């Protein structure tokens, strides 16, 4: 009865730990997906504000609606390169391209007019467009920019958290399995020792019993002949 209870407890512990480990993995993956989704929504608002700031910094420096000077182009290019969020920027004036810059030429293709067309759709990049009145109020500058709404640092941090949780869960699972294996082995050994051992041949058992009944020092009985 005792060993049966131990076996039942061992199986219950294994099942409980399996449920616990699966729940931790599911919750970790769900947290990663949820946090990424929340970060994208939150950073989209921040990227839109950054785009508005970039427009306000660039628009006053554009002195010609036909062509930018070298100083103006260098200023805008350095502004884009030093910004971690800007992936591409186009500036048009009456469908005349004044400026075009991309972080990676392989990420975007030429679209109609002033459009920025990504080669592949991505949840991490958003396209923003805005118009700013030029010197004459009937004319305007058209800005189109692609901004990152999730930086590699954000993904790396969340990935590290998931990795550490999975690593801890893996190590704890290995330790649990080793402890459980040793417990099962001890249980099997104890169960084997508790089993009754088979008796030997009946003759041998009887002779040992007879020998045990004869006290030491008692002379053997001799047969008495009757005349």
UniProtKB/Swiss-Prot annotation:
Signal peptide: none annotated. The chain crosses the membrane at residues 13-35, 155-177. One of its GO terms (cellular component) is plasma membrane. Keywords: Cell membrane, Membrane, Transmembrane, Transmembrane helix. Residues 217-227 have a biased composition (Pro residues). Its main location: membrane. It is found in: Cell membrane. It is a multi-pass membrane protein. Residues 192-227 are annotated as: Disordered. This is Uncharacterized protein TP_0173. It comes from Treponema pallidum (strain Nichols).
């Amino acid at each position: 009865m005792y060993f049966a209870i131990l076996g039942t407890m061992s199986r219950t512990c294994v099942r409980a730990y399996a449920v616990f480990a699966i729940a931790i993995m599911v919750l970790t993956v769900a947290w990663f997906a949820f946090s990424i989704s929340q970060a994208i929504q939150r950073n989209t608002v921040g990227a839109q504000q950054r785009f508005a700031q970039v427009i306000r910094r660039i628009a006053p420096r554009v002195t010609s609606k036909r062509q930018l000077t070298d100083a103006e182009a260098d200023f805008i290019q350095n502004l884009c390169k030093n910004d971690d969020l800007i992936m591409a920027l186009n500036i048009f004036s009456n469908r005349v391209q004044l400026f075009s810059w991309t972080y990676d030429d392989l990420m975007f293709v030429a679209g109609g007019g002033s459009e920025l067309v990504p080669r592949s759709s991505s949840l991490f990049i958003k396209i923003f467009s805005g118009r700013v009145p030029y010197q004459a109020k009937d004319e305007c500058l058209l800005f189109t920019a692609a901004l990152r709404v999730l930086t590699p640092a954000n993904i790396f941090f969340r990935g590290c958290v998931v990795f550490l949780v999975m690593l801890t869960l893996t190590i704890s699972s290995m330790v649990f399995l080793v402890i459980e294996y040793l417990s099962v082995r001890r249980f099997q050994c104890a169960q084997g020792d508790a089993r009754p051992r088979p008796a030997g041949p009946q003759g041998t058992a009887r002779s040992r019993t007879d020998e045990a009944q004869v006290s030491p020092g008692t002379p053997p009985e001799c047969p008495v002949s009757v005349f």
